Amino acid sequence: MSTTTQNRLESRYGGITITGTPHALSVWTIIALRFVMGGMILLAGLGKYAFVPGGDSFDAFGYLSNVHGASPVSGIYATMAESAVLLDVINVIIPLTQVLIGVALITGAFVRLAAFGGALQMLMFYLGGWEGEWLALFDSTLVYAVVFVALGAFAAGRIGGLDAYIEQIRVRGEPLIERYPKLRYLLG
């Protein structure tokens, strides 16, 4: 295995340029991170279905109705818990999106969309779990959200994933990503 290929990262923002040269093996770390996060959220989603061995029927009522008053989302979560229709929708959306995010990350397809969805879901869990203590400001849910953002930023789907192939599908003689450049925000 050759590790002589050098990667280069560069970003300019607000007049500041930051550059870096990560080790060539960093691509394997990104793939591993994509698989681990994909597996984690896939199993979390599957565990919310009663038909899965070891799974249990998911009900968000207990979580939404017991958010600590210091949480910035306590009011909106309590309102969600009071609406039977909205609660039914949430009970379907959370496990379904977790399964879809997991599959997307593991296969490397639509990784940026999946990473955004994962980060958003973790941020909502983080805000719902915060009880106002500053020592609990940085917990595992926030770390998960940041890792999802990193996977999207690194375009982890282009590294050993299906996004590298999806982007090159030819549509009317040109690669999909060139024909529809806005797809760069979903793929990668």
For the regions a language model picked out, list residue spans one by one.
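Extended, low-polarity transmembrane helix blocks
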Residues: 1-100, 107-188
